[in-house]
Amino acid sequence: MSPEHRRVMRSRQIFVTASAVFCVVGTLFGTGVIGTRVAESAGGDLAADATLIAPAGTAFSIWSLIYLGLLAYTIRQWLTPFADTPRHRVTAGLAAISMILNALWLLVTQVGWIGLSVLVIVALLLTLGLLAARLLDRPEPGISEFVVVDGTFGLYLGWVCVAVCANIAAALVGWGLPSEGALAVTATIVVLAVVVAVAWFLGRRLGGNWFVAAGITWGLVWVGVARLTDEPESVPVGIASLAAAAAVLFVTWRGSQERPADRLARGNHRDYGNHGDHGNHGNGRGGEPRPVGPGAPDATASTRPTPPTAAPAGPGPAPSPAGPAAEPVPPPAGAEPAPGASTEPDRPRES
């Protein structure tokens, strides 16, 4: 490993570790150790009973698993076998940014900036979505990689899919929209349908990632439990939440049945759709692969017929463009030879 490569690797490790430390500081504020608990911040707009789509308090215990996974991820990236893998190189920066955004969200809510918190959590959602896509595009991981990396960030992404909806609803209520009533119930059910649509998209793009599905389902189930057993009570929202949780599991299962080759083909179509060959980048007409290797025809060569070349200058007979020379035709009987013509048969030339 070159000194420059080692320096880049070390910088990446330090960046991830510093982000994890910042995340811990934000968590200490969010849990009330050195600040105000999230449920009590922002005027109570983020409490479990503030909106119809707020999950029950028990749902937030998923953070214990997520934080444990982030800690394991941070420690693991210092170990030699995992410090410079292709997967880690393309995801470490996004993982660090996700921890920074997490802490930033907790700090923003401490001062009651509920509108800004929406922007932060949307940025967190996009970051985790990109990270999950990059993990899928890399070779299959080992068991520890699968649990620590795919598991942690899959749960993280799934939970944030629900949290971003709850955050937006809290902001709208904080700005004066009603938290109960027919309009609130209808809007909440529409939002639940959007969550299912997002899960469907992630199921297709990520190949049925069950960690993501678990995070989404966990949040939706506890939304349903809260609406059926706690204030603000809403039977329609409770039933819709549980139905949405079941729908998430179904669309994830459907996504897991799709062949990897189909997902790859869909990705290639997106990547090469503007390259002039309708996505068949590097392929021949109709998508058939061109031969590769020694003796293969040049893909850029013209397939038009080549016109006959001119006869080379110099001594010797010129080749006939019509093919091999025809046999000499003997003169008619009784005809006199042309002046100067030889009456002897042609002899082969000596080389």
Which residues are covered by each model-predicted region?
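Membrane-interface helix caps and helix-loop-helix hairpins in membrane proteins
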Residues: 104-118, 175-182, 202-206, 228-234
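Alpha-helical transmembrane segments of multi-pass membrane proteins
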Residues: 20-38
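Central hydrophobic cores of alpha-helical transmembrane segments
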Residues: 210-221
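Internal transmembrane alpha-helix with an interfacial aromatic "cap," most often the third helix
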Residues: 68-88, 92, 96-118, 122-145
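Short aromatic-rich membrane-water interface segments that cap or initiate transmembrane helices
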Residues: 46-62, 147-156, 176-187
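Alpha-helical transmembrane segments of multi-pass integral membrane proteins
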Residues: 18-26, 94-105, 123-131, 149-167, ...
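Membrane-interface transmembrane-helix boundary segments in multi-pass integral membrane proteins
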Residues: 54-59, 179-195, 224-249
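Membrane-interface capping segments at transmembrane-helix boundaries
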Residues: 8, 79-80, 134-139, 251-269
